[in-house]
Amino acid sequence: MWIRQDWLDNLGLEVPRTWDELVTVAEAFVTQDPDGNGEADTIGILGPSNSDHMNAVGNNQYGLDPLFSSFQSYPQYWLQDEDGTVKYGSIQPETRTALEKIQKLYTDKLIDQEMLVRNDSKEPLLAGKVGIFFGPWWSGYTVADATLAGEADWRAYFTPLAEDGNYYTHMPNPTRDRKSVV
């Protein structure tokens, strides 16, 4: 999770560690003019573009996978529970809960209102209008671009903890890449 530290500082906010704290920070980023330009023109949480996915198995720049993981929801994954039963993650109760929470973020305008419609999610990021985004390991390059484009102080933090106080993420098992040995 990448957050504008300068916006946190401007508003006197702490780094969010839980879902509720994330919602509080996103709301402040949308309603309290963190960039100080006197306009209501900031996006709390950036969403994926029209060529990306809300969640994905693999490459997912600006996707919302960490929000799903906060509820131990893993859409598009086949999961094995404690007794060995295989279940499809997209239809589990945890996914419904995650979708309801994400829907509320959208309804409350705390998440990108143009997500999945916008042609390029990087545009508002480079324009300095975004407070939080999620991305894979190579997001540091995006942050470097955004920093060069303005005064942004982006920092990487853990995504929100689940209600049980643990940190969850998704990772295929077994994990593999596209290398071959001949």
What are these regions (language model features)?
Residues 1-182:
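Extracytoplasmic/secretory soluble proteins
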